[in-house]
Amino acid sequence: RPSWTVDSDSAKYSSFLDSLREEFGRGTPKVCNIPVTKKANNDKFVLVNLVLPFNRNTITLAFRASDAYLVGFQDRDSKTNKLRANFFSDEYRALSGKYKSIFTDAEVLAPALPCASTYTDLQNKAGVSREKLSLGVSSLQTAFTAVYGKVFTGKNVAKFALISIQMVAEAARFKYIEDQVINRGMYSSFEAGARITLLENNWSKISEQYHKSCKLGGGQFTEEEMKLGLLLYN
């Protein structure tokens, strides 16, 4: 299982993202030498451990294997000391019944999280747009600490989700985002801005263009789009 100790070691961060890309692409032929996600409608998930360096607290993120979307996470409830499985409100009905097959060491199923998994709802609950949200190691550490073992609010869950999605899944999809985290987010924080969110919003379309251009040749891509780390199955 890919694991990242959330600190300022950029080489380990890159290695973590490479192993995550390979995990998403396992069993699917590469296209243009880029890993490709699983076929849609399969019931598989990719789990990732985020570990805080100063106390070894661990949050396990669960991403759908077919599209790298975050569906929930596991942490340890500070009141009961039990590992709890947490799913977003829009995923809860479909996934809560099989939480033990997703988070195999979870001891309890928590109620649905107070937000949905969509960027729209997460931004509303966090009270900040993705463009203006601070990304970086210290931002992720702070957001992690605000949810780990705590009583969940829409705000603390949404902020943690927005930061971890962009620094994990979106950075796996786009090496340009990985580079931005390494260059601007290891020792300070930065706002994603419009260039990053434009890439995030168009991953499906860019993936489709890659599939076509790798078969037929040609294809026009921006410098940022050229640095693709993971393709959506086509």
Curated annotation (Swiss-Prot):
<comment type="subunit">
    <text>Monomer.</text>
</comment>
<dbReference type="InterPro" id="IPR001574">
    <property type="entry name" value="Ribosome_inactivat_prot"/>
</dbReference>
<keyword id="KW-0652">Protein synthesis inhibitor</keyword>
<keyword id="KW-0378">Hydrolase</keyword>
<keyword id="KW-0800">Toxin</keyword>
<dbReference type="GO" id="GO:0030597">
    <property type="term" value="F:RNA glycosylase activity"/>
</dbReference>
<comment type="function">
    <text>Ribosome-inactivating protein of type 1, inhibits protein synthesis in animal cells. Inhibits cell-free translation in rabbit reticulocyte lysate system with an IC(50) of 0.17 nM.</text>
</comment>
<keyword id="KW-0611">Plant defense</keyword>
<dbReference type="InterPro" id="IPR036041">
    <property type="entry name" value="Ribosome-inact_prot_sf"/>
</dbReference>
<comment type="similarity">
    <text>Belongs to the ribosome-inactivating protein family. Type 1 RIP subfamily.</text>
</comment>
<feature type="disulfide bond">
    <location>
        <begin position="32"/>
        <end position="115"/>
    </location>
</feature>
<dbReference type="GO" id="GO:0017148">
    <property type="term" value="P:negative regulation of translation"/>
</dbReference>
<feature type="active site">
    <location>
        <position position="170"/>
    </location>
</feature>
<dbReference type="InterPro" id="IPR016139">
    <property type="entry name" value="Ribosome_inactivat_prot_sub2"/>
</dbReference>
<dbReference type="Pfam" id="PF00161">
    <property type="entry name" value="RIP"/>
</dbReference>
<dbReference type="InterPro" id="IPR016138">
    <property type="entry name" value="Ribosome_inactivat_prot_sub1"/>
</dbReference>
<dbReference type="InterPro" id="IPR017988">
    <property type="entry name" value="Ribosome_inactivat_prot_CS"/>
</dbReference>
<keyword id="KW-1015">Disulfide bond</keyword>
<dbReference type="GO" id="GO:0090729">
    <property type="term" value="F:toxin activity"/>
</dbReference>
<protein>
    <recommendedName>
        <fullName>Ribosome-inactivating protein lychnin</fullName>
        <ecNumber>3.2.2.22</ecNumber>
    </recommendedName>
</protein>
<dbReference type="InterPro" id="IPR017989">
    <property type="entry name" value="Ribosome_inactivat_1/2"/>
</dbReference>
<dbReference type="GO" id="GO:0006952">
    <property type="term" value="P:defense response"/>
</dbReference>
<dbReference type="GO" id="GO:0030598">
    <property type="term" value="F:rRNA N-glycosylase activity"/>
</dbReference>
